[in-house]
Amino acid sequence: MGNWAVNEGLSIFVILVWLGLNVFLFINYYKVYDDGPKYNYTRKLLGSALALARAPAACLNFNCMLILLPVCRNLLSFLRGSSACCSTRIRRQLDRNLTFHKMVAWMIALHTAIHTIAHLFNVEWCVNARVGISDRYSIALSDIGDNENEEYLNFAREKIKNPEGGLYVAVTRLAGITGIVITLCLILIITSSTKTIRRSYFEVFWYTHHLFVIFFIGLAIHGAERIVRGQTAESLEEHNLDICADKIEEWGKIKECPVPKFAGNPPMTWKWIVGPMFLYLCERLVRFWRSQQKVVITKVVTHPFKTIELQMKKKGFKMEVGQYIFVKCPKVSKLEWHPFTLTSAPEEDFFSIHIRIVGDWTEGLFNACGCDKQEFQDAWKLPKIAVDGPFGTASEDVFSYEVVMLVGAGIGVTPFASILKSVWYKYCDNATSLKLKKIYFYWLCRDTHAFEWFADLLQLLETQMQERNNANFLSYNIYLTGWDESQANHFAVHHDEEKDVITGLKQKTLYGRPNWDNEFKTIASEHPNTTIGVFLCGPEALAETLSKQSISNSESGPRGVHFIFNKENF
């Protein structure tokens, strides 16, 4: 198993704390509504569905408070910057923000289902009591406060002639209307967040996610009508439950048992969510302010395999390696923002991104930049671009290790372009304070053309390290995962040439996929008693493989080899 705690210990601790708080809130509120004297008569009317509705409501408040925080990108970047003195293992938790966001969303979905189903039973019990087909106790409780301005218990205020009137009661009350609206919003948000829709129909995902505005407004006013009611404190003092609970016929007739009075709980949800909503509002204001700052496209480069490079300048823009930005092109869409990893280095006087053309928005940007035309495009014809960021990622920590493994799959190589460029600049400037001593770089790609735009950078690094007698600083392995028979024959013919036929590098391209178990064991033997950073930008399947290898090849004890796995998430 290796040292599992090295990679996952803190993450599991955070998750257990979160789950523990959910369990605590559920049990605590369940006991209040299932055992508390305040809700004794409410339980007589509604049964166990009362507690089963209110306990998940408390958990919903808690999780709806949390759901916005992981997507406050500027807040996370601030925390990452302010925690620079902390352990990389602590900062890694910030890089799992989207994973936590999804977990909280599923928890909200679970408690919404329980809350909704329980309240459907509550509506039925209330309506049955008003219709007169319930037990006499429930009917008597429902008759309390039938007149105006009296302190009633049953929210179904008028006697219903139609026994099927439950639906009517539900959809004519504020709680019912808002409950239906926010549940529909939640269903649309979750169903449009599947991997297939995010990748193939990002616009659908983006627009439906903004239903969260309606969701939170509905959530804030959901309890304003106070339909879940309990006995007032004054009534509990006057109306002794031990004496009066079984003497319903004598209520109001004997001094010891006055008619009980009821009141609804004041709305609480807004108190839970007002703080995160304010933070998120500030987040959006910062994003809007940044989006209004002028961005100049200085160069557009068309690379093979339908990839374009945008080089841009923006006043006051400062970046670190591996960071990402959000880009909006009003000519393509006035509302949509899309994330892209920065491929430039902090030492350069511009910032750049590489964009693979795979969807409607990227196709629109490709055409707006004139990349679909053969002739040269004048700078004044280039579209206006808005940029929000940069935002921090796990790759910022790459210089915190002496040894790192960088693994990129396809276009996922982009964050490592920034890192390798920065390394090259640091060596050009004779940087002596560089902690990083060894880079193992792996690039997996299925098409030969995809290597072309990155080969120049690797050649520069290869030459630079040889000139400085430090050729061992960078070990890179490029894997071609897709080829046909004619390509294989061509590669075989040119195998003995000094430079690789695909990349033009001295290091030959490998075919197939790495044997990760061998790679990790070899690196572990080369660097005993070392903490090694493993950085991935690639698919989930590869992330799972590398995470398992990092755990299984890490040794127990503080002086052993430790592989710390990091994955890009945005």
Swiss-Prot record:
> Which SUPFAM superfamilies does this entry report, sorted A to Z?
Ferredoxin reductase-like, C-terminal NADP-linked domain, Riboflavin synthase domain-like
Query: Where are glycans found on this sequence?
Result: 40
Its principal location? membrane
Q: Where in the cell is it found?
A: Cell membrane
Q: One biological-process term from Gene Ontology?
A: cellular response to ethanol
> Which amino acids does the record list as binding FAD?
199-200, 337-339, 341, 354, 356, 361-362
Protein residues bound to heme b 1: 101, 206, 209, 280, 287
| Cellular component, GO, one term | monoatomic ion channel complex
Which residue intervals are topologically Cytoplasmic? Answer: 2-9, 73-95, 195-203, 286-570
> How does the annotation summarize its subunit structure?
Component of the phagocyte NADPH oxidase core complex/cytochrome b558 complex, composed of CYBB (heavy chain (beta)) and CYBA (light chain (alpha)). Component of the phagocyte NADPH oxidase complex composed of an obligatory core heterodimer formed by the membrane proteins CYBA and CYBB and the cytosolic regulatory subunits NCF1/p47-phox, NCF2/p67-phox, NCF4/p40-phox and the small GTPase RAC1 or RAC2. Interacts with NCF1 (phosphorylated form). Interacts with NCF2; the interaction is enhanced in the presence of GBP7. Interacts with RAC2. Interacts with RAC1.
According to UniProt, the name of this protein is NADPH oxidase 2
Instruction: Name the species this protein comes from.
Output: Mus musculus (Mouse)
